[in-house]
Every structure is written in structure tokens, then in C-alpha cells.
Amino acid sequence: MSEQRRATTHLIGGFSGGLVSAIILQPFDLLKTRLQQDKTSTLWKTLKSIETPSQLWRGALPSCIRTSVGSAMYLTMLNSIRQAISKGKNTGSTGSSYLPQLNMYENMFSGAVTRALTGLITMPITVIKVRYESTLYQYTSLRYATSHIFRTEGLRGFFRGFGATALRDAPYAGLYMLFYDRMKVLVPTLLPSNVVKLNSDNRYSTYASTLINGSSAFSAAVIATSITAPFDTVKTRMQLEPAKFHSFTSTFWHIATKESVRNLFAGISLRLTRKAFSAGIAWGIYEEIVKKFV
């Protein structure tokens, strides 16, 4: 297969997985944003403020654009970096995946660098999405949201909170890739032997590999999300209240000392749920598309 077709396959796989997960899990993202914007809010109070079910999908369009395009870019770049690292090395792969296995440091490096680059490129969409989901801004359309940010803050406004985002996403992606690679080896040992039978090509069935990859992605996301949760809260505050919160350090210190350390983990249950299921869905779809067409 040509390199161009191989890259296209990774683009389509990443886009498809990201789009499906974004549509299904948008309500969790919206509730998380609103919980983080108000230090006194609770999940129950936030749910009561939702007037119609359709409001749970407010901000779905920028979320779908960011997640699908971001996922396509991320997974394509990630594969290129991982292939470059593994070139000339006998890295091998697991029975559920065609992706090369790397060591701990290579996994963390490839995930962190790729996520930071993708985050920078998709940052304007992220800022618009967060503001649109929030009740602090009464944006009536994405066009108005975009023009308002540009008019009041300039181009810099579209990259508000990038430092905190990079500090959250780069370690998250590095940790995620580390645990995901390890889980793909561990999960088959925990499943019934009749489920994880290898075929003549030393590969698992579509059902088994989807189960293994989805479960591995889910577990890896739970661990990585728990560790990086405070960075997400700081990032959201900086994007919602730029006049009050100017830097990562001052925002982190304000929340930890003026409010409570617990507030650094505001919305973690929703973020855990969304990130875990998002990873399970997106990587499950992505891995199967790559297996079918690469």
C-alpha cells in the first residue's frame, strides 16, 4: 500500500472515531464545562438548569469539528511518528492491532509531542466550543461567538489557555499511549479463552480485537484523565474568564488557596466518563478501520 493511501486510512479512521464519540458524548462535555465555571455548582443543580434535552447538545457542532478533525490529525501524525521511531527496529504488534509496539519512553514521547501540536492547531475551535457551552456567554451563533472573541480579544483570544491545555493534553496523551500499549497485552489474559482465539494470521477476530482495543483505551483513559484533571479545570477557567485568570500558575494557585484543592478536580466524574468512553469508541473504530484497509 502506498504511503498516501496509508495516511488517508489513518485520517478516515481517526475522523470517524472522533465524530461518533463527539456526537454521543457531547452532554458530558457541556455539563463538565458548566460545573467548572461555577465553584458552588453541583451536578444536580446543573442538570436542573437544563430546560430541554436538546440543550445538552449545545456546542455540539464545534465539538464535532474539533474532535473529528483533531482526532484525524492526531492519529495520522501519531502513526507517522511511531512508524519513524520503530523503523529499523523489531517492534512487533499485538494480535488486536497493526500499530507498532514501542517502549515506555517512546510511547510517552510520541503521544505528548503529537497531542501538543494537534492542540495548538485546534485551539481556536476549543475556545469557541467552551465559551459556547458556558452560561457566562450568551452567544446566539458560532459566527457571533467567533466575531466577538476576535473583536474583544484579537487573535490571542483564540489561543487563550493553550499553556494549560498543553500541560494537560501532552502528559495525558503520553500517559495514555503508555498504558494503552500495556493494556492491549494485559486485557487478552483477562478474557475467556474462547473469545481471544488467534486465527491463522495470528490475529484476533473483529469482535475480540474491538473488545480488547476498546477496553484498553477505556482503562488507559481513566488512569491518564485522573492524573491530569487539575490541568483541565485550570484550562477551562482561563478560557471562560480571561480578564480574571491570566496565567496557569496564578489560576492554579487561586483555585487551590482561595477556593479549595477539591475544586481542581471539579467535573472529574464527567470528564472521566466522557474521556474513557470517547477513547473506547474512537480507538475501537480507528483500530478496526486501520486493520481492514492498511
UniProtKB/Swiss-Prot annotation:
UniProt keywords (A-Z) are: Membrane, Mitochondrion, Mitochondrion inner membrane, Repeat, Transmembrane, Transmembrane helix, Transport
PROSITE patterns in alphabetical order: SOLCAR (PS50920)
One cellular component term (GO) for this entry is: mitochondrial inner membrane
Q: Which residues form a coiled coil?
A: none
Catalysed reactions, as listed in the record? glycine(in) = glycine(out)
Cell compartments where the protein resides = Mitochondrion inner membrane
Judging by the UniProt lineage, the source's domain of life is: Eukaryota
The transmembrane residues are 11-36, 59-85, 108-133, 161-184, 212-238, 267-285
GO BP: glycine import into mitochondrion
- One example GO MF annotation: glycine transmembrane transporter activity
RNA-binding as UniProt keyword: no
Segments annotated as Solcar repeats? 5-84, 102-186, 208-292
Membrane-protein topology: Multi-pass membrane protein
What disulfide bonds does the UniProt entry report for this chain? none
Q: Which function does this protein serve?
A: Mitochondrial glycine transporter that imports glycine into the mitochondrial matrix. Plays an important role in providing glycine for the first enzymatic step in heme biosynthesis, the condensation of glycine with succinyl-CoA to produce 5-aminolevulinate (ALA) in the mitochondrial matrix.
Q: Which family does it belong to?
A: Belongs to the mitochondrial carrier (TC 2.A.29) family. SLC25A38 subfamily.
PANTHER family registered for this protein in UniProt: MITOCHONDRIAL GLYCINE TRANSPORTER
Return the protein name: Mitochondrial glycine transporter
Source organism lineage? Eukaryota, Fungi, Dikarya, Ascomycota, Saccharomycotina
